[in-house]
Amino acid sequence: MSSQSLYKVSGNIAANALVNNEQYKTMYQESIVNPEGFWREHGKRIDWIKPYTKIKKTSFDDHNLSINWFYDGTLNASANCLDRHLSEHSDRVAIIWEGDNASEQRKITYGELHADVCKFANALRSQGVRRGDIVTIYMPMVPEAAVAMLACARIGAVHSVVFGGFSPDSIASRVIDGKSKVVITSDEGMRGGRAIPLKRNIDDALNHPDVTSVEKVIVLKRTGGKIDWVEGRDVWWHSLLETASEHCQPEEMGAEDPLFLLYTSGSTGNPKGVLHTTGGYMVYASMTHEYVFDYKAGEVYWCTADVGWITGHSYMVYGPLANGATVLIHEGVPNHPSPARLGEMIDRHKVNILYTAPTLIRALMAEGKQHFDQFDGSTLRIMGSVGEPINPEAWRWYHEVIGHEHCPIVDTWWQTETGGILITPLPGATDTKPGSATRPFFGVQPALVDNMGNILEGENEGNLVLLDSWPGQMRTVYGDHERFVLTYFKTFRGMYFTGDGARRDEDGYYWITGRVDDVINVSGHRLGTAEVESALVSHELVAEAAVVGYPHDIKGQGIYAYVTLTRGTEESEELRQELRQWVRKEIGALATPDLIQWASGLPKTRSGKIMRRFLRKIAANEVTNLGDASTLADPAVIETLIETRLNRTE
């Protein structure tokens, strides 16, 4: 193995780890050669009401697509996260919660969480929620968000969690698509010392003329802030619980029955509802949580992701709770009120495993390591990274300043669509290289292909595809199966196309190089460029817009917009700020453009297609080697854009 920046598995980790390198190789080989036998065994890690006898019926043929796992078994996800721990671990703490203000803290045992979930499940039933109904959840980072999800799962309802930073328009589009009858929210959330008007955003969303399905809005009292109230529609969370029973029999669900919807950005403007089912997802989320983080019974595990993202679903709720872990949930941001907050919380709650995002690490790095002078960190054992590729400088800083050079880093690559981690080191098995996601998890078959779909062998770079299914894989785009087939299985026949590029080095390690489609990754969160462009063009003074990502020191990628104004409109700094606020209102703060360049014209082919590769290079300040511009209708446009670019370094 090449020695460039190689971090060897330490002896003390290897001695106690779940798997070492030899075991990894043996298990991985078995999972690829004999997936039926491998998953027949590992599917037993969760509790089944009716045990499965059929394991895998899958095909990536776009004319005969099929993804089925454990498909004749029945189970309940909520029972796997709660009931099965009660006989031995009822008093174990399931959730440690720390508010935005550190003086607010709660501990909830598995027994208490079980009672809370049963009561709220009965409350949902009292509001007309039935098996198969879609319930929209728009909540702050409080334990009740997990309670709401698990209560839906308990009665067979399908939850659709919307990130608390999304705008009313974004919420409305998700409610309309899922035809939700019930929405669960909070009066306000707290984040970084500010109150977030969640209920007001829901009220605005539900005023959208196309929202016709919602009958009830259940409101959690978090801050006691002033809110508007719609009689007959709105109902307080606490008033529903006053009469609810603590006994609720879990619904028996088929392995392929839906568990949740989670909307994600695509390369077209409309958000797509990623649908995950119950059996395979629960097996995969719990197994990856245990093996990737080398989880040991009783450990305190902190995932800093928001519950509105897939990481919050798989590695804050379903995976850890299925494994009986103690999960730390933090309402605010780990660098407020100061960058020392992350270290203080690790020490205060004796955190053993930390899973966070490169964007936070880079933000802390920019503030300086002096904020960690008082940080002990001796309880920390394993650290993870998620959301985007981590640059080697941030990896090393994380390793040295937070991990004190004794914690392995698992740099995990996966997607909303994959349900769980696909490429990752395993702490006791994998020597790591800063910036590399290293090797595939069990049952995962990555490959690199060229643009024609030919498989590239050995050390190479290309489009990252997957050759066979795994249990956590999404099953469809809700209400639009054709879009599912088109997006993931038509580009390269017989393969799942990830939308990412990657290279494989001489040791077989994978390095993710970023999106190859029109999706940008801002602070670990995906945004479709078409979504941001649509928002800009909906402003009356904007004639045309093209949006690309560009390298950003903190966020990984920033948003760079080229905007052509309507004829006669004056370019001004005021209008630039107005457009930034406009996008913020339309989509949410995450989508706010960092840079807006006025463009009298955009580089287009004669057929009118915008050539984004030129725009990406100009935004990244790579203007010396733009490549062939002969297909452009007006090559002079490029010169103008280069001269007026905003991201100059000289």
From Swiss-Prot:
Q: Which GO terms describe its molecular function?
A: acetate-CoA ligase activity; AMP binding; ATP binding; metal ion binding
Where is the PTM N6-acetyllysine found along the chain?
Answer: K609
Alphabetical list of CDD domains matching this protein? ACS
Q: Which UniProt keywords apply?
A: Acetylation, ATP-binding, Ligase, Magnesium, Metal-binding, Nucleotide-binding
Which coenzyme or cofactor does it need?
Mg(2+)
Specify whether Metal-binding is a keyword of the entry: yes
Q: Does the keyword Nucleotide-binding apply?
A: yes
Catalyzed reaction equations: acetate + ATP + CoA = acetyl-CoA + AMP + diphosphate
Query: Where along this sequence does the record place binding of CoA?
Result: R191, G192, G193, R194, T311, N335, S523, R584
GO term, biological process aspect, one: acetyl-CoA biosynthetic process from acetate
* Binding locations of ATP: G387, E388, P389, D411, T412, W413, W414, Q415, T416, D500, R515, R526
Reported EC number(s) for this entry are 6.2.1.1
Q: Which HAMAP family match?
A: Ac_CoA_synth
Belongs to which family? Belongs to the ATP-dependent AMP-binding enzyme family.
User: What is the role of this chain?
Assistant: Catalyzes the conversion of acetate into acetyl-CoA (AcCoA), an essential intermediate at the junction of anabolic and catabolic pathways. AcsA undergoes a two-step reaction. In the first half reaction, AcsA combines acetate with ATP to form acetyl-adenylate (AcAMP) intermediate. In the second half reaction, it can then transfer the acetyl group from AcAMP to the sulfhydryl group of CoA, forming the product AcCoA.
Name of the protein? Acetyl-coenzyme A synthetase
Q: Which organism is it from?
A: Shewanella putrefaciens (strain CN-32 / ATCC BAA-453)
Q: What is the lineage of its organism?
A: Bacteria, Pseudomonadati, Pseudomonadota, Gammaproteobacteria, Alteromonadales
